[in-house]
A protein has these predicted regions:
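Short glycine/serine/threonine-rich phosphate/pyrophosphate-binding segments
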Residues: 83-86, 142-148, 170-174, 196-200
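ADP-ribose/adenylate-binding Rossmann-like module
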Residues: 161-171
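Internal catalytic-core helix/loop-beta-alpha segment
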Residues: 14, 115-149
Protein backbone atom coordinates (compact mmCIF):
# COMPACT_ATOMS: atom_id res chain seq x y z
CA UNK A 1 0.00 0.00 0.00
CA UNK A 2 1.34 3.42 -0.95
CA UNK A 3 1.76 6.30 1.49
CA UNK A 4 -1.15 8.04 -0.23
CA UNK A 5 -3.44 5.06 0.31
CA UNK A 6 -2.44 4.89 3.96
CA UNK A 7 -3.39 8.54 4.37
CA UNK A 8 -6.68 8.11 2.53
CA UNK A 9 -7.81 5.13 4.59
CA UNK A 10 -6.90 6.40 8.04
CA UNK A 11 -10.03 6.15 10.17
CA UNK A 12 -11.42 9.39 11.67
CA UNK A 13 -11.03 8.13 15.24
CA UNK A 14 -7.41 7.15 14.54
CA UNK A 15 -6.72 10.59 13.09
CA UNK A 16 -8.27 12.24 16.14
CA UNK A 17 -6.25 10.04 18.51
CA UNK A 18 -3.00 10.82 16.72
CA UNK A 19 -3.86 14.52 16.65
CA UNK A 20 -4.23 14.58 20.41
CA UNK A 21 -0.93 12.74 20.79
CA UNK A 22 0.76 15.46 18.73
CA UNK A 23 -0.95 18.18 20.78
CA UNK A 24 0.21 16.54 24.02
CA UNK A 25 3.78 16.32 22.72
CA UNK A 26 3.92 19.92 21.52
CA UNK A 27 2.05 21.35 24.50
CA UNK A 28 4.55 19.88 26.92
CA UNK A 29 4.37 20.72 30.62
CA UNK A 30 1.39 23.00 31.15
CA UNK A 31 0.53 22.87 34.87
CA UNK A 32 -3.20 22.54 34.20
CA UNK A 33 -5.47 20.21 36.12
CA UNK A 34 -6.56 17.19 34.03
CA UNK A 35 -10.07 18.40 33.19
CA UNK A 36 -9.00 21.92 32.27
CA UNK A 37 -6.23 20.47 30.14
CA UNK A 38 -8.78 18.43 28.18
CA UNK A 39 -10.74 21.58 27.35
CA UNK A 40 -7.60 23.40 26.22
CA UNK A 41 -6.46 20.46 24.09
CA UNK A 42 -9.84 20.17 22.36
CA UNK A 43 -9.71 23.87 21.46
CA UNK A 44 -6.21 23.42 20.07
CA UNK A 45 -7.42 20.37 18.16
CA UNK A 46 -10.24 22.43 16.61
CA UNK A 47 -8.05 25.41 15.71
CA UNK A 48 -4.45 24.13 15.42
CA UNK A 49 -3.59 27.23 17.46
CA UNK A 50 -1.47 26.69 20.56
CA UNK A 51 -1.95 30.32 21.64
CA UNK A 52 -5.16 29.19 23.31
CA UNK A 53 -3.09 27.31 25.89
CA UNK A 54 -2.21 30.73 27.30
CA UNK A 55 -5.20 32.88 26.36
CA UNK A 56 -8.01 30.70 27.72
CA UNK A 57 -9.04 31.92 31.16
CA UNK A 58 -11.03 29.69 33.49
CA UNK A 59 -12.84 30.90 36.59
CA UNK A 60 -12.34 28.77 39.67
CA UNK A 61 -15.16 26.28 39.16
CA UNK A 62 -15.92 26.76 35.46
CA UNK A 63 -15.09 23.28 34.24
CA UNK A 64 -16.40 21.47 37.31
CA UNK A 65 -19.73 23.35 37.31
CA UNK A 66 -20.13 23.14 33.53
CA UNK A 67 -19.59 19.38 33.47
CA UNK A 68 -21.93 18.80 36.41
CA UNK A 69 -24.69 20.97 34.94
CA UNK A 70 -24.54 19.35 31.51
CA UNK A 71 -24.60 15.93 33.13
CA UNK A 72 -27.74 16.99 35.00
CA UNK A 73 -29.52 18.10 31.81
CA UNK A 74 -28.60 21.77 31.40
CA UNK A 75 -29.28 23.25 27.98
CA UNK A 76 -26.97 25.39 25.88
CA UNK A 77 -27.73 28.83 24.45
CA UNK A 78 -25.64 29.60 21.36
CA UNK A 79 -25.23 33.03 19.82
CA UNK A 80 -25.09 31.74 16.24
CA UNK A 81 -26.24 28.78 14.20
CA UNK A 82 -22.56 27.98 13.54
CA UNK A 83 -21.91 27.47 17.25
CA UNK A 84 -25.07 25.39 17.56
CA UNK A 85 -24.12 23.28 14.54
CA UNK A 86 -20.75 22.41 16.06
CA UNK A 87 -22.10 21.15 19.38
CA UNK A 88 -22.52 17.40 19.78
CA UNK A 89 -26.29 17.37 20.21
CA UNK A 90 -26.45 13.59 20.49
CA UNK A 91 -24.37 13.61 23.68
CA UNK A 92 -26.19 16.70 24.97
CA UNK A 93 -29.57 15.06 24.38
CA UNK A 94 -28.43 11.90 26.16
CA UNK A 95 -28.35 13.98 29.35
CA UNK A 96 -31.70 15.65 28.59
CA UNK A 97 -30.32 18.96 27.30
CA UNK A 98 -30.83 20.81 24.04
CA UNK A 99 -29.39 23.74 22.10
CA UNK A 100 -31.24 27.04 21.80
CA UNK A 101 -30.35 29.66 19.19
CA UNK A 102 -32.63 32.61 18.48
CA UNK A 103 -30.59 34.85 16.21
CA UNK A 104 -32.24 33.69 12.98
CA UNK A 105 -35.82 33.92 14.24
CA UNK A 106 -37.91 36.37 12.20
CA UNK A 107 -39.41 38.05 15.26
CA UNK A 108 -35.95 38.57 16.72
CA UNK A 109 -34.84 40.36 13.56
CA UNK A 110 -37.98 42.50 13.58
CA UNK A 111 -37.58 43.51 17.22
CA UNK A 112 -33.91 44.34 16.66
CA UNK A 113 -34.88 46.68 13.79
CA UNK A 114 -37.60 48.33 15.83
CA UNK A 115 -35.32 48.93 18.80
CA UNK A 116 -32.25 49.85 16.80
CA UNK A 117 -30.10 47.12 18.29
CA UNK A 118 -28.61 43.81 17.18
CA UNK A 119 -30.26 40.43 16.78
CA UNK A 120 -27.57 39.00 19.07
CA UNK A 121 -28.60 41.31 21.90
CA UNK A 122 -32.29 40.46 21.47
CA UNK A 123 -31.37 36.77 21.39
CA UNK A 124 -29.89 37.01 24.86
CA UNK A 125 -33.08 38.64 26.12
CA UNK A 126 -35.06 35.75 24.66
CA UNK A 127 -32.74 33.31 26.39
CA UNK A 128 -33.50 35.01 29.70
CA UNK A 129 -37.04 33.59 29.44
CA UNK A 130 -35.86 29.99 29.33
CA UNK A 131 -36.35 27.78 32.35
CA UNK A 132 -33.74 25.54 33.91
CA UNK A 133 -29.95 25.72 34.15
CA UNK A 134 -28.20 27.21 31.12
CA UNK A 135 -24.72 27.22 29.64
CA UNK A 136 -24.13 30.15 27.28
CA UNK A 137 -21.80 29.62 24.32
CA UNK A 138 -20.87 32.94 22.71
CA UNK A 139 -18.43 32.45 19.85
CA UNK A 140 -19.17 35.19 17.38
CA UNK A 141 -20.97 38.28 18.62
CA UNK A 142 -19.49 40.55 21.29
CA UNK A 143 -22.88 42.31 21.40
CA UNK A 144 -24.35 39.05 22.73
CA UNK A 145 -21.73 38.98 25.47
CA UNK A 146 -22.38 42.66 26.28
CA UNK A 147 -26.13 42.01 26.46
CA UNK A 148 -25.56 39.00 28.71
CA UNK A 149 -23.34 41.12 30.98
CA UNK A 150 -26.13 43.71 31.24
CA UNK A 151 -28.78 41.09 31.98
CA UNK A 152 -26.63 39.54 34.70
CA UNK A 153 -25.92 42.94 36.24
CA UNK A 154 -29.60 43.92 36.18
CA UNK A 155 -30.58 40.53 37.61
CA UNK A 156 -32.86 40.16 34.61
CA UNK A 157 -31.71 36.61 34.04
CA UNK A 158 -31.06 33.70 36.40
CA UNK A 159 -27.32 33.38 36.88
CA UNK A 160 -26.00 31.14 34.11
CA UNK A 161 -24.26 27.96 35.18
CA UNK A 162 -21.41 28.88 32.85
CA UNK A 163 -20.61 31.51 30.23
CA UNK A 164 -18.29 30.47 27.41
CA UNK A 165 -17.24 33.88 26.11
CA UNK A 166 -15.03 33.54 23.06
CA UNK A 167 -16.18 36.02 20.38
CA UNK A 168 -13.61 36.88 17.73
CA UNK A 169 -12.79 40.21 16.12
CA UNK A 170 -11.65 43.76 16.71
CA UNK A 171 -14.62 45.86 17.92
CA UNK A 172 -15.81 45.44 21.53
CA UNK A 173 -14.38 41.92 21.63
CA UNK A 174 -11.71 42.38 24.30
CA UNK A 175 -13.93 44.73 26.30
CA UNK A 176 -16.91 42.36 26.35
CA UNK A 177 -14.73 39.50 27.55
CA UNK A 178 -13.24 41.58 30.35
CA UNK A 179 -16.73 42.59 31.50
CA UNK A 180 -17.87 38.97 31.74
CA UNK A 181 -14.71 38.10 33.63
CA UNK A 182 -15.69 40.76 36.16
CA UNK A 183 -19.18 39.35 36.67
CA UNK A 184 -20.06 36.96 39.47
CA UNK A 185 -20.50 34.06 37.07
CA UNK A 186 -18.42 31.02 36.20
CA UNK A 187 -16.78 31.57 32.84
CA UNK A 188 -14.35 30.32 30.23
CA UNK A 189 -13.01 33.24 28.20
CA UNK A 190 -10.41 33.57 25.47
CA UNK A 191 -8.55 36.73 26.35
CA UNK A 192 -7.70 39.01 23.46
CA UNK A 193 -9.12 39.13 19.94
CA UNK A 194 -9.05 35.43 19.15
CA UNK A 195 -11.98 33.08 19.51
CA UNK A 196 -14.79 32.07 17.20
CA UNK A 197 -17.69 29.68 16.73
CA UNK A 198 -15.34 26.71 16.41
CA UNK A 199 -13.74 27.54 19.76
CA UNK A 200 -17.09 27.91 21.52
CA UNK A 201 -18.35 24.58 20.18
CA UNK A 202 -15.07 22.85 21.04
CA UNK A 203 -15.29 24.02 24.65
CA UNK A 204 -18.87 22.82 25.04
CA UNK A 205 -18.03 19.49 23.43
CA UNK A 206 -15.04 19.03 25.73
CA UNK A 207 -17.33 19.52 28.72
CA UNK A 208 -19.86 17.09 27.26
CA UNK A 209 -17.20 14.44 26.68
CA UNK A 210 -15.93 14.89 30.23
CA UNK A 211 -19.50 14.52 31.49
CA UNK A 212 -20.00 11.34 29.48
CA UNK A 213 -16.55 10.00 30.40
CA UNK A 214 -15.83 9.75 26.67
CA UNK A 215 -12.05 9.44 26.35
CA UNK A 216 -11.62 11.30 23.09
CA UNK A 217 -8.03 12.39 23.72
Amino acid sequence: MSNTEQLEYALPRDIEKRSFQIIEEELGSHGLDPQTAQVVKRVIHATADFDFAKSLHFSNHAVQDGVAALKDGASVVADTTMVAAGINKRVLASFGGSVHVFVSDADVAQEARERGTTRSAISMERAARLKGPLVFAIGNAPTALLALHRLIGDRAIPTPVLVVGVPVGFVNVVESKELIMGDDVEHIVSRGRKGGSTVAAAIVNALLYLASDDRRW
